[in-house]
């Protein structure tokens, strides 16, 4: 999952650009480190690990700092805190701020509004019950446009090589680099089991 988290920042954030990092736990704070590593300017909105984010405060910070993107974690692994995304995503969306959400610990275990998130990050472990080693991402068209407009200083941590890769085909697909194929088969099997049980039943348990 960490590769996906860093790749989202590396691909979307140009040096000097401001990113609002919402943090009420370890992984929320970690986003700020990635922003700094890639030359961005993090503005950290930090609250206690048991507290939710205040949408009004998020709006004020957006108005004050004009960030190109905002990062947050859906479920903080160490505490199990599940953040309510709806209001915060609404505020950020209305302001035109790109949203990056770490859903590594929640995707597959509880509903995640991926259609409202510009980059939603998951991983093969956690709720997918598959071996670790694969990052999963959904990327909006708006986010792809920002990737293409942002100078990419890395290949491995850039999303750009994945632009246009179509996995929904029976034809041979050339991927940007070699994957651990055994993990891909394992993830496919895990997803089949989740779908066979039914997502609503999975969410209930």
Positions of predicted regions on the chain:
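Predominant activation on well-ordered alpha-helical scaffold segments within soluble catalytic domains
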Residues: 6, 10, 32, 59, ...
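Active-site phosphate-binding strand-loop segment of PLP-dependent enzymes
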Residues: 53-104, 108, 119
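Conserved active-site segment immediately N-terminal to the catalytic lysine
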Residues: 114-125
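Conserved beta-loop-alpha segment that forms the PLP phosphate-binding cup at the N-terminus of a helix
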Residues: 1-20, 24, 28-32
């Amino acid at each position: 999952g960490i590769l996906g988290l860093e790749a989202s920042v590396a691909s979307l954030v140009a040096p000097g650009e401001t990113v609002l990092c919402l943090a009420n736990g370890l992984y929320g704070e970690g986003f700020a480190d990635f922003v700094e590593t890639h030359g961005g300017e993090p503005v950290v909105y930090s609250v206690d690990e048991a507290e939710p984010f205040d949408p009004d405060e998020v709006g004020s910070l957006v108005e004050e700092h004009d960030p190109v993107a905002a990062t947050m974690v859906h479920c903080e692994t160490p505490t199990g805190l599940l953040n309510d995304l709806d209001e915060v995503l609404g505020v950020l969306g209305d302001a035109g701020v790109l949203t990056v959400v770490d859903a590594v610990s929640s995707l597959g275990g509880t509903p995640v509004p991926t259609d409202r998130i510009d980059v939603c990050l998951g991983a093969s472990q956690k709720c997918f019950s598959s071996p670790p080693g694969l990052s999963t991402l959904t990327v909006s068209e708006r986010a792809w446009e920002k990737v293409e407009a942002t100078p990419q200083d890395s290949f491995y941590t850039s999303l750009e090589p994945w632009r246009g890769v179509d996995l929904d085909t029976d034809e041979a697909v050339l991927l940007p680099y070699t994957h651990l194929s055994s993990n891909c088969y394992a993830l496919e099997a895990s997803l089949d089991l989740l779908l066979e049980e039914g997502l609503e039943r999975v969410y209930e348990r």
